[in-house]
Amino acid sequence: KQGFARVLDEDEMTAETMKKEIFALYENKEKYVVAMNQIGCGVSKFEENYINRFKRTDDYNQGIFFYIKDIKTNEIWSATDDNNCEQFTVQFMPDRNQFEKTEEEIKTKFKVTVDANEPVEIRRLEIQNKTQEEKILEVTSYFEPVLSRKEQDYAHQAFNNLFLVYGYDEENDYLTVKRKKRESHQKELYLIAKMQTNSEKIGETEYEIDRAKFTGRNNFGIPKAVQNSTPLSKKIGLTTEGIV
């Protein structure tokens, strides 16, 4: 495998260019795979099970996304989308995928790696403030968990979602998702999603598992909760449209 890098000029950042079906694939010994394209859309898989929802035929971006919001200016951008930014660099390398961009004088470096021996992926976001003023930033991650084979999800998405059970570990500050068995011979699958920071954090971690509350109805762009800085509900329960 070889990595490559190139800087996209502003006139190259078209929807057609950025949605090329060029995927970087990484697989570890535990058959954990991450596949991504040039704007961060894609899927993570464990064996034959999709971690997040992804369907190439859908006309909106799908994957595991990180949104950054400048509280003072209300500017919002994704760590992996071009978003008409000042500079955008993508690198697909043997050991990681890396996205670098500069937006509103905030430079971000987003790295995606897979542990060599365990079914674990790490998404690391580094933020550099290039201004002389203090910045308060909101960082929000978002994806739709699946934990099943894609055929099951494609056949009946709402029914497939009914087998997901959500939880939150307050002591260790992480969300859990369990896929219940449909048949006795099947294994139960578990997912843990955790965010942590080395910088100063204001307030407690917030979370939401209801897609409609987070994104808003029929909204496939920046989630409404991110746009409005709406406090997330921090409630665990049943949902037919779950998110993490």
Residue ranges: model-predicted function:
Residues K1-V244:
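Anionic coordination/interaction segments
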